[in-house]
Amino acid sequence: MTLLALGINHKTAPVSLRERVSFSPDKLDQALDSLLAQPMVQGGVVLSTCNRTELYLSVEERDDLQEALIRWLCDYHNLNEDDLRNSLYWHQDNDAVSHLMRVASGLDSLVLGEPQILGQVKKAFADSQKGHMKASELERMFQKSFSVAKRVRTETDIGASAVSVAFAACTLARQIFESLSTVTVLLVGAGETIELVTRHLREHKVQKMIIANRTRERAQILADEVGAEVIALSDIDERLREADIIISSTASPLPIIGKGMVERALKSRRNQPMLLVDIAVPRDVEPEVGKLANAYLYSVDDLQSIISHNLAQRKAAAVEAETIVAQEASEFMAWLRAQSASETIRDYRSQAEQVRDELTAKALAALEQGGDAQTIMQDLAWKLTNRLIHAPTKSLQQAARDGDNERLNILRDSLGLE
């Protein structure tokens, strides 16, 4: 049995190839059935995300294994093998285990340390168990990878610092406000960045969110997901005073929030502080707003400096994480080898017990027929000895004939001979 990991990712293949090799969720069961129908495959898990498509397999070793699996992947997706071969990576046994642990821990992600990949790996594993998983070694490898990812999160700072603009904006808000559960957040725009911001805010228990957008339809879809209120851009002037935090990201060519607008809001708030995070380019908030007392304005450049600092921290944490992964992968492979030895020991013991039972039964039958007890016991001992040493004796003789001193010494050591 051999453990394999093969696939492509954002580092080895452009999106034009990754999208052709991806497995859609509605066809995943069919793909797993087809994969497990291959004679050398004992168990398989398919991980398919926007940044990677990977097969994790338990297989029987054979000479054409790599070619057979590449051929299956290309046939399934109607690809030319040459298009895929140069982008494909291939990991075996310890390297396969280490790769999965790195993936689950976010060490191989486009955004170093991102947490979403662990959920994606868990889902891929769960999907494989719906009547598809056959190999216990593969199941153990995934379960171990989940615990390693948790250990990496717990023992290092790999996920502690924001490395996306959306996450950095929310981290900044959490640093300024002791609790986000009591604040009101005004979100200007309804694009992808604001969508990510709303998810982070919801995770931090923000109760009141207001979304201002040029088109109500898109904003309403997002608002329905997070329980927010939708207003028009023209309503910002009137509603700004309610907001403790304003996060803006639109494609407007001109500022949407001006100095005068914020001055009026601060006056209505009796100068309670406001945090304004402008992550738009061009800027949505006039730079002069930052000069107002109690208005704390941060631009996308300010966030980028936070992200750069945090990315350096994550890279330092990644060194610790890699050490954990290397240690855990080595220990897992040692455990796997021990399991293989346990099966051999069990088979050897079972064989010896069969010989014992067979010869004991014959001896008892001879005693019942009135045979001489001493003669029967001596015969039992002689036959038992010969049967048990027959296979080791043949191996010793063959090693001697082959001039294989190393094997001969291993056999002597195994038999406890000085």
Swiss-Prot record:
Oxidoreductase in keyword set: yes
Site note Important for activity, residues: H99
Main enzyme class: oxidoreductase
Binding site for NADP(+): G189, A190, G191, E192, T193, I194
EC number: 1.2.1.70
Pathway(s): Porphyrin-containing compound metabolism; protoporphyrin-IX biosynthesis; 5-aminolevulinate from L-glutamyl-tRNA(Glu): step 1/2
Swiss-Prot/TrEMBL catalytic activity: (S)-4-amino-5-oxopentanoate + tRNA(Glu) + NADP(+) = L-glutamyl-tRNA(Glu) + NADPH + H(+)
Residue numbers binding substrate: T49, C50, N51, R52, S109, E114, P115, Q116, Q120
GO terms classed as biological process: protoporphyrinogen IX biosynthetic process from glutamate
UniProt-recorded Gene Ontology molecular function terms: glutamyl-tRNA reductase activity; NADP binding
Gene3D superfamilies: Glutamyl-tRNA reductase, N-terminal domain, NAD(P)-binding Rossmann-like Domain
A Pfam family this chain is assigned to: GlutR_dimer
Role: Catalyzes the NADPH-dependent reduction of glutamyl-tRNA(Glu) to glutamate 1-semialdehyde (GSA).
Domain remark in the UniProt entry: Possesses an unusual extended V-shaped dimeric structure with each monomer consisting of three distinct domains arranged along a curved 'spinal' alpha-helix. The N-terminal catalytic domain specifically recognizes the glutamate moiety of the substrate. The second domain is the NADPH-binding domain, and the third C-terminal domain is responsible for dimerization.
Miscellaneous comment as given in the Swiss-Prot or TrEMBL entry: During catalysis, the active site Cys acts as a nucleophile attacking the alpha-carbonyl group of tRNA-bound glutamate with the formation of a thioester intermediate between enzyme and glutamate, and the concomitant release of tRNA(Glu). The thioester intermediate is finally reduced by direct hydride transfer from NADPH, to form the product GSA.
Subunit structure: Homodimer.
Protein name: Glutamyl-tRNA reductase
Organism: Escherichia coli O1:K1 / APEC
